Every structure is written in structure tokens, then in C-alpha cells.
Amino acid sequence: MKLQLIAVGTKMPKWVEEGYKEYSRRFPKDMPLELIEITAGKRGKNADIARILQKEGEAMLAAVPKGNRIVTLDIPGKPWNTEQLAEQLEVWKLDARDVSILIGGPEGLSPACKTAAEQSWSLSPLTLPHPLVRVVMAESLYRAWSITANHPYHRE
């Protein structure tokens, strides 16, 4: 099973790239973590936010390979603790499909992305900066994998 993060935004600070790479390289060959960056729409004083969300959503959904399970990262989604995320990984593995996790831009996800999703996950009730979310997601998914693999990374 492949895990795919599809995130709005490019040109992240170096610490984000390094943090993401540190965790993504740790994944086993049979469960690689891939990041696909979607160019954010131009936001200005008179920007049409609904149109920007629509365009970003179209680009995100176009990046999802056919047949993948789509999971959105959204504040109103279901909160999972680390053990619950590990359980989700096991469920996803049994489903025998790759998983695409959608991370929206500053205004969130388009209605089309939310409709296409089979699951919605709330990483936190806090609003987190999008660069930080990439690193937290990579670490959280790695930690969940470590639980399923009985790897000593996670300690209770």
C-alpha cells in the first residue's frame, strides 16, 4: 500500500523539507510515503476564494490515482489518536488500495474534495500552519506504522 499526501502549496521552508524527508525515508518499501504538491491559487485583496478553492480541488483530485481511497484532513473530521491511526492503517492495508490524504490550502478544501472523500480526519482542533502539517503528518503516519510493525519507535 502506498500513502500519498496531496498538499496545496509549494516552496516550503528548508526545515519543512528536511523534516518531511526525515520521516518519509523511514517508511518500508512496501508502504512508501509520497508527497505531491499542488500550486496554490493566487490570493490577493480581491481574490475569488471560491474559484481558487475549486481550482485547487480540481488539481488535487486530478492527482489522485484511480481507485485510491481518499481521506481529507479537515478540522470537522474524526479525531484519531496514535493507536486509532495505527488501526486505520491496518484497515487500509486490508482494503488493498493505496491511500491519498488531501491537505487543503489556507481556506481548506473544496466541496468537491470533501464529497470525494471516504473518510475525513481531524489532525487537531487547532488551526495549524500548513508547512508544519506536512511534518506532523509524516511523523504521525510513521509512528502509526511503527505500532503496526512492532517497531520500537513508539513507546507508551
UniProtKB/Swiss-Prot annotation:
S-adenosyl-L-methionine binds at residues 73, 104, 123-128. It is found in: Cytoplasm. One of its GO terms (molecular function) is rRNA (pseudouridine-N3-)-methyltransferase activity. GO terms for cellular component: cytoplasm. InterPro entries: Alpha/beta_knot_MTases, RlmH-like, tRNA_m1G_MTases_N. Its EC number is 2.1.1.177. It catalyses: pseudouridine(1915) in 23S rRNA + S-adenosyl-L-methionine = N(3)-methylpseudouridine(1915) in 23S rRNA + S-adenosyl-L-homocysteine + H(+). Keywords: Cytoplasm, Methyltransferase, rRNA processing, S-adenosyl-L-methionine, Transferase. It comes from the Bacteria. Specifically methylates the pseudouridine at position 1915 (m3Psi1915) in 23S rRNA. Belongs to the RNA methyltransferase RlmH family. Homodimer. This is Ribosomal RNA large subunit methyltransferase H. The gene is rlmH.
